[in-house]
Amino acid sequence: MAHLVEGTSIIDGKWQLPILVTDLNIQRSISVLGNLNVGGLMLELVSECDVERDWSDHALWWPEKRRWLQHTRSTLDQNGITAETQLEFTPMHKEARIQLPDMQMIDARVDFSVNSFKATKKLCRDLGIRYSEELSLKRYIPPEDLRRGTSDADNMNGPLSMRPGEESVGPMTLRKAAPIFASQSNLDMRRRGQSPALSQSGHIFNAHEMGTLPRHGTLPRGVSPSPGAYNDTMRRTPIMPSISFSEGLENEQFDDALIHSPRLAPSRDTPVFRPQNYVEKAAINRGWLDSSRSLMEQGIFEGDIILLRFKFMNFFDLNPKYDPVRINQLYEQAKWSILLDEFDHTEEEATLFAALQLQATLQRDSPEPEENNKDDVDILLDELEQNLDAAALNRRSDLTQVPELADYLKYMKPKKLAAFKGFKRAFFSFRDLYLSYHQSSSDVNSAPLGHFSLKGCEVSQDVSVGQQKYHIKLLLPTAEGMIDFILKCDSEHQYARWMAACRLASRGKSMADSSYQQEVESIKNLLKMQSGNGNENGNSNTASRKAAAVKLPNDFNVDEYISSKYVRRARSKQQIQQRVSDAHGNVRQLTATEAKLQYIRAWQALPEHGIHYFIVRFRNARKAELVAVAVNRLAKLNMDNGESLKTWRFANMKKWHVNWEIRHLKIQFEDEDIEFKPLSADCKVVHEFIGGYIFLSMRSKEHSQNLDEELFHKLTGGWA
């Protein structure tokens, strides 16, 4: 008989199955047959406990296999349960410590039996955050493991007890968090000596990990106390008593502590994780939980720290009326990513971010302006009227003329030898999705010097308003591969029009689209806010637009507003304060919510926004390489400078899946297949980023906004 073991007494073919009732801390042995179903086993167990209580939230958990027995009609034989099996009868909802994007720690009851996608959805609903598919949960990883990266070696020993820092990889597999092997010494050399935090002891934190310190006197399993663990600033744990995490928020009654986050600054006494290179930036994407598996299946247990973060940088319909919590939490995550140098940005941009942050802080207690008395129906009718007017205008434009830009610009091809001669001047024309250029305007009827389709190109900016520098950087797909092309504009107005056209063309839209003029105005507004950043090199036109400087608060701390990289470069803190004060003059009319939204828009305009780095090894390759997943593409990058070497568009992708046996991600494109093994993060993480962005790209205001969870898991599940 399959269930017979030595020493086990058999009565009528029955055998004893031990089950631990966790919340009562008692163990019961139930006499069972292999054909008993899971539901019947729970009924017998409850009867054996002889305790009057509500057991509806309890389920059976199999610790050795790390899975819930959720199919109540399946039998013990079907589940592979024998007399040697140890089961637990435990509540599905348990207490967890959730760190929000603004670094606040809250205690919440979370369902540990459903997949993390559902758990995130419920948590976001309770917090008042719409579009939960943009967020995800992340495990706490000890900082020393975060610095070192993950092992390249497979764990061939089968399932083991999961410890802090370990990540589950597909069904019944595990990978340990260990240093990259010696074969990856080239990566280790890039790390060594480049991060000031690497040689220091204590907890390392960044915008994704910062503030994950436990309450005073408690630490996660396997984590030792350190000098920074009980730092006064970092152990702040604001609990919002007015929020009941078992009930949803109704009637827009959002908690003020979630809309206006408490003040928190990086402490000089606590070492911080500021990524110094692309290997360290790749480490930030470790720890994302598998959306299709439950928390306990991934080694998250009661009382553990879980990080809630915006994962996908594609934000749908940010509305101040419905999203005060969502806007603030997104703003806070953006703020910390800027302060801790997760995104490269210029000094001018840093000053603008500081000015917007200052305005949001100063306006914190000021009431938002009263909205008009229009109800929701009137507002929707107004939006519909505007959309119909724009559509009608577009149709008229299509019948009469196709929008076109034509102007003299300067250009450069950085990878050509001619680049040493600097920029050349030519006459450019932009029509539909195509960019052409001639020697002069009189040559437009002859063959162009160059003709490119901008659909699917990569567009980034290199702008300094103070220095009158307006560069548009294009990475263009051609038959010979990707080529770099830089356009140099002469003025803000010219730059705004051409940059807007390039951005829309990269998304497959022409200037006839109704969003073109909005894009132009958005770029102009951003340039206008940067125009008062106190740069001495600015011309008289820029200087004349500066508003009067504001007097900074007495408790103004530059470390709370400016990245330490630029604080160190400044001659003095007074110089930084003066620049922030000057820049603030251009944003002082904004409300707190408007300042946060402008901060988010400026953050989204950064070249690295929406790019997630991973260290991988391509099939049959010897050395590791840098890969980036973006909103609409996958790219292979130079690991030293981040320069794009090759790009694969999601639009050209036919199929992708994970081979769990060798932990490879295989992607089939129209013209080639690629296969690689992620080294810096779990292979499921990379797969979810690709499938998740494809899922988010399907959202539109014209379609129902009901969350299609089945489609999400189809795109992110990892199975062929």
From Swiss-Prot:
Domain PH: 402-507
Membrane topology of this protein: Peripheral membrane protein
Transmembrane segments: none
Principal location listed in the UniProt entry: membrane
Keyword Membrane: yes
Tissue: Mainly expressed in muscle cells in both embryos and adults.
GO molecular function annotation: cell adhesion molecule binding; integrin binding; protein-macromolecule adaptor activity
Subcellular location(s) of the protein: Cell membrane; Cytoplasm, Myofibril, Sarcomere, M line
UniProtKB keywords: Cell adhesion, Cell membrane, Cytoplasm, Membrane
Renumbered residue ranges of the record's region Disordered: 145-170, 210-236
A cellular-component GO term for this protein: plasma membrane
Gene knockout outcome: RNAi-mediated knockdown results in impaired mobility, mitochondrial fragmentation and disrupted integrin attachment complexes in muscle. This leads to degradation of muscle proteins in the cytosol, myofibrillar defects and disruption of sarcomere organization.
Gene Ontology biological-process annotations: cell-matrix adhesion; establishment of protein localization to organelle; integrin-mediated signaling pathway; locomotion; mitochondrion organization; muscle cell cellular homeostasis; muscle organ development; positive regulation of locomotion
Domain FERM: 288-614
Function: Component of an integrin containing attachment complex, which is required for muscle development and maintenance. Probable regulator of cell-extracellular matrix adhesion. Required during initial muscle assembly to form dense bodies and M-lines.
Free-text comment about domains: The FERM domain is not correctly detected by PROSITE or Pfam techniques because it contains the insertion of a PH domain.
Similarity comment text for this entry: Belongs to the kindlin family.
PANTHER family: FERMITIN 2-RELATED
Complex formation: Interacts with pat-4/ILK. Probably forms a complex with pat-4 and pat-6. Component of an integrin containing attachment complex, composed of at least pat-2, pat-3, pat-4, pat-6, unc-52, unc-97 and unc-112.
Name this polypeptide is given: Protein unc-112
Species whose genome carries this gene: Caenorhabditis elegans
